[in-house]
């Protein structure tokens, strides 16, 4: 039941944010009484903490599962495409919602963000090949991270409004433009 509560809470927090999600919403989503939630969790903040932890664990697992050994420009394109469009949209939306998380959770969220950024940095650096890329390593990483953050915001809205296929086509064009910016001619 604890896993089901968290799974449903992730959906609710991703759609309504922390303040918009109530314990009543969570209890109704798993068909239990609100009082029964307290058997599993002390309060909404604990449920949110666990949801955020699961979100970041999902991202790290996704990164580690979805890389391949093709650390080429084509491999980078495939990696970026997967990291934008194959991630469960609930986690993207929850990630976007973190900016409005309770202030008491800032240090925990910052820790999780640092962990995911380290994992992502370590994965992206494998695609860096100075014989093909005109930027230095840090500029290359920063440009890719900026691109991913922008697309996460877009993807969260695209999925909400049902234009994901249009977004995929735009992504393809924009990632090629991005790659052309830093490839050596």
Swiss-Prot record:
UniProt keyword Transcription regulation, yes or no: yes
Residue stretches spanning the membrane: none
Repressor found in the keyword field: yes
Protein origin, superkingdom: Bacteria
Keywords linked to the UniProt accession: DNA-binding, Repressor, Transcription, Transcription regulation
DNA-binding region: 22-41
Note: Binding to the ica operator DNA involves two IcaR dimers and is highly cooperative.
UniProt xrefs under PANTHER family: ACREF/ENVCD OPERON REPRESSOR-RELATED (PTHR43479), ACREF_ENVCD OPERON REPRESSOR-RELATED (PTHR43479:SF11)
Protein name in UniProt: Biofilm operon icaADBC HTH-type negative transcriptional regulator IcaR
